[in-house]
Amino acid sequence: MLVIPAIDLRDGRVVRLRQGDFAQSREFARDPLALAGDYAQAGASWLHVVDLDGARAGTPRQIELIGQLAQTTLHVQAGGGVRDLDDVQRLFDVGVARVVIGS
């Protein structure tokens, strides 16, 4: 069995949206890197990251932070605003192992 924890990023913080509504977001954690470390310490080997700013804008916005997460011991799969091969390549260039392209 494989359990993959997920982090939704907005303005550099981990948030939870209520039913996908950006107007109803709640900060879950200030430091995404610390939370990723907690997941790794709990035994996770993968991390799913969603760039909510990117999803809203139509192009990834949290590339630098996602790259920092990819430099941890976790394998990172990321998405949010990925619309073309340039976006995919930018994520691979910062160390992401898998890229999720959504509608």
Set out the residue ranges of the language-model regions.
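Conserved N-terminal beta1-alpha1 strand-loop-helix module at the mouth
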Residues: 1-74, 82-86
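Glycine-rich phosphate-binding active-site loops on the catalytic face of alpha/beta enzymes
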Residues: 82, 89-103
